[in-house]
A protein has these predicted regions:
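Acidic, serine/threonine-rich low-complexity disordered tracts
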Residues: 22-123, 165-269
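Active-site/ligand-binding surface loops and adjacent short beta/alpha elements
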Residues: 124-180
Length: 269
């Protein structure tokens, strides 16, 4: 589960986000038609090898008859990595035009195992109702129903929303807590800011980036899952991600981006 939060975590929260179940938010970071691609690298026996690629697209669509944003993230391992570990993941979400989460689905194949997580959102009387579904690797269907009084997000919807947050005034060490839902649970997560750095992407361009870390709470302690670097401009594009996985370490580097809403002012000349 953790490695799928990376590209998303990559963009989490530039302000407090879970105070109450009044969940609309403005969007000034992306527009319909945005498309991002990445190279993936995996550390195999102390050697970094090209592991595959990832792509993310965002378009305006409809959900249950209403206008909505549709975002999808797909990762694919190459033949070389498939010999060691099969990686086939697809994430999909819908968000209202006011950035309220509506739906989330993650289909992931790791090795010979395949699982699905789904979250369905609805909003009534200041409450958020969640219908959660998980198809386990053994073929078992698990369902859960929850009603909460604060906003809840999944790994992809938080990505869309967080890109419009403003990090001005943050100091190194600043932390933000927020809830993340999957097909079974609602879990505490945390974002830690560590200042600005310059990062070279796989397109040969160097960017001024915000460095952040995504942490999850396990056994009462927060554990670092990924360090990520997002462009220091209004787009907040993930440029590089360093992932700490149970089966090793991985990195992702930006290759291309098109259909951006704002000028890329973070390029280092």
């Amino acid at each position: 589960m953790k490695k799928y939060r990376i590209l998303v975590a990559a963009l989490v929260a530039f302000t407090a986000i879970a105070a109450q179940a009044q969940c609309p938010f403005h969007n000034d970071a992306f527009k319909s038609g945005e498309f991002l691609t990445y190279n993936l690298y995996y550390n195999w026996q102390f050697v970094w090898v090209k592991a595959g690629n990832a792509s993310m697209s965002t378009v305006q669509s409809r959900y249950n008859g209403h206008p909505a944003y549709r975002a999808s993230l797909t990762t694919r391992g190459n033949d070389r990595v498939d010999q060691m570990f099969v990686l086939r993941d697809t994430l999909l979400c819908y968000s209202s035009l006011d950035m309220e989460p509506l739906y989330f689905r993650k289909g992931a194949r790791e090795g010979k195992r395949y699982g699905v997580d789904e979250v369905f959102y609805s909003y009534h009387d200041g409450k958020v109702k969640l219908r959660q579904h998980q198809l386990t690797s053994s073929g078992e269907h698990l369902w859960a129903h929850r009603t909460v009084s604060h906003c809840v997000y999944d790994m992809l919807n938080i990505f869309l929303r967080a890109r419009s947050f403003n990090p001005e005034g943050w100091k190194s060490g600043h932390e933000i807590d927020f809830p993340i839902a999957d097909g079974k649970n609602i879990s505490p997560a945390r974002l830690r800011y560590s200042g600005k750095v310059k990062i070279k992407a796989d397109n040969g361009v160097k960017y001024r980036c915000l460095k952040l870390s995504y942490l999850e709470k396990e056994d009462g302690k927060y554990k670092r899952i990924v360090d990520f670097y997002v462009s220091d401009d209004k787009n907040h594009i993930p440029v590089r991600l360093d992932m700490f996985l149970k089966f090793g370490a991985a990195k992702a580097f930006l290759v291309s981006m098109k259909g951006l809403r704002n000028p890329v002012t973070s390029v280092v000349r």
